[in-house]
Amino acid sequence: MNPNQKITTIGSICMVIGIVSLMLQIGNIISIWVSHSIQTGNQHQAEPCNQSIITYENNTWVNQTYVNISNTNFLTEKAVASVTLAGNSSLCPISGWAVYSKDNGIRIGSKGDVFVIREPFISCSHLECRTFFLTQGALLNDKHSNGTVKDRSPHRTLMSCPVGEAPSPYNSRFESVAWSASACHDGTSWLTIGISGPDNGAVAVLKYNGIITDTIKSWRNNIMRTQESECACVNGSCFTVMTDGPSNGQASYKIFRIEKGKVVKSAELNAPNYHYEECSCYPDAGEITCVCRDNWHGSNRPWVSFNQNLEYRIGYICSGVFGDNPRPNDGTGSCGPVSPKGAYGIKGFSFKYGNGVWIGRTKSTNSRSGFEMIWDPNGWTGTDSNFSVKQDIVAITDWSGYSGSFVQHPELTGLDCIRPCFWVELIRGRPKESTIWTSGSSISFCGVNSDTVGWSWPDGAELPFTIDK
């Protein structure tokens, strides 16, 4: 083979190898494209486990579930239409209280990022229950927690997180700027009511689905304030109670009917010699019952009951088992204010069952410590101090605080009645303990007609923290 033939042969072999290599590269590209095109989901968002996301779009809850199978994400959607929380059912018959949640916020906050809070409360939609709370714009064990014993400041905000979780920046949702608040769900969206501003001219901002829809101006220019617990919804309307005026004398009290975040009707109570603050309200058979705090001169609790047209009745719980704090020892009650130790008070609640009443109260008659539930079968109308059931919630040696009611509607539970529930705030820090801060955790219970147990579920945090030393 002469030199020219060698050159031609080598060139031909190189050309064949090049063509084969090019074909292999083209085949590899086609293979990658085909493999990518048959996958569904977003390959840039790898999910290590299943994840459910609930979004809200045009009055419809959209439940999106991402299922991770062999690095391939399949998106499934199930639309859950909004409902109207009717509130027409009666309260469920119950024999005791089953523990529902405990957030352990102070214990976790010694090392984790947990908000400094007060006035926590719980409210439920037809899909979920959430804990609402008033922050101080500060975290536990941080310098900004200093001086948070103060009730009203421009830094306080209403936020919420899933029930039973410690309130932190990572799981909490901003709701409103507020130093007094309420919230509830009508089956379509959350209504929030946040009061902020100066004592002599505060304004309540109403939001529906997170959007400002209305405002209410202080009408007596004397610390307008609201429930610090959930409002109550019946047939698409939500109802709340507000107070404006002295905390130690005759004040003014209004009930409001709110639809889709707008006030459609209000009524001022004609209630001389009554004092209503921080009402705990619930629906029962289409009407609203609120049990409140008398900070003026009653150691028993005042109540107001009204229908959807705001036609109302007023009274005091008659039982000789007194529900406020401070209070005298149990004795003979009154259907008006019981004066001994009637000054000051604490937010609380009761549930009416005919002539009977479940009374929640601190165990101590003088300090905010301990908690118990008492069934007085004649206590709504009778003045004796006889009761038939007592269930321990927090021991008298442990701190408690505010308490309030919430309900779970049949649309959530699947029952044919409204389940009564309550929460208890477990206050820690100032003014009773040697810290620079005041905060709290919470526990909650729901009524059941089955076995229950009395015990003590205290806050349990060991104080002081590092910041306090």
Curated annotation (Swiss-Prot):
Recorded catalytic reaction(s): these are:
Hydrolysis of alpha-(2->3)-, alpha-(2->6)-, alpha-(2->8)- glycosidic linkages of terminal sialic acid residues in oligosaccharides, glycoproteins, glycolipids, colominic acid and synthetic substrates
Where mainly located? virion
- Active site (UniProt): D151, Y402
**What other note does the entry give for this protein?**
The influenza A genome consist of 8 RNA segments. Genetic variation of hemagglutinin and/or neuraminidase genes results in the emergence of new influenza strains. The mechanism of variation can be the result of point mutations or the result of genetic reassortment between segments of two different strains.
Which residue ranges run through the membrane?
13-33
Q: Outline which residue ranges sit on the Intravirion face.
A: 1-12
Q: How is it modified after translation?
A: N-glycosylated.
- Look up keyword Protein biosynthesis and say if it applies: no
Q: Which residues bind substrate?
A: R118, R152, E277, E278, R293, R368
Q: List the disulfide bonds.
A: C92-C417, C124-C129, C184-C231, C233-C238, C279-C292, C281-C290, C318-C335, C421-C446
The protein in question is named Neuraminidase
UniProt membrane topology term: Single-pass type II membrane protein
What is the primary gene name for this protein? NA
- Where is the stretch described as Hypervariable stalk region? 36-90
State the domain notes.
Answer: Intact N-terminus is essential for virion morphogenesis. Possesses two apical sorting signals, one in the ectodomain, which is likely to be a glycan, and the other in the transmembrane domain. The transmembrane domain also plays a role in lipid raft association.
Instruction: Please give the activity regulation comment for this entry.
Output: Inhibited by the neuraminidase inhibitors zanamivir (Relenza) and oseltamivir (Tamiflu). These drugs interfere with the release of progeny virus from infected cells and are effective against all influenza strains. Resistance to neuraminidase inhibitors is quite rare.
- Spell out the subcellular localization from the entry: Virion membrane; Host apical cell membrane
Kindly list the GO CC terms recorded for this protein: host cell plasma membrane; membrane; virion membrane
Q: How does it assemble?
A: Homotetramer.
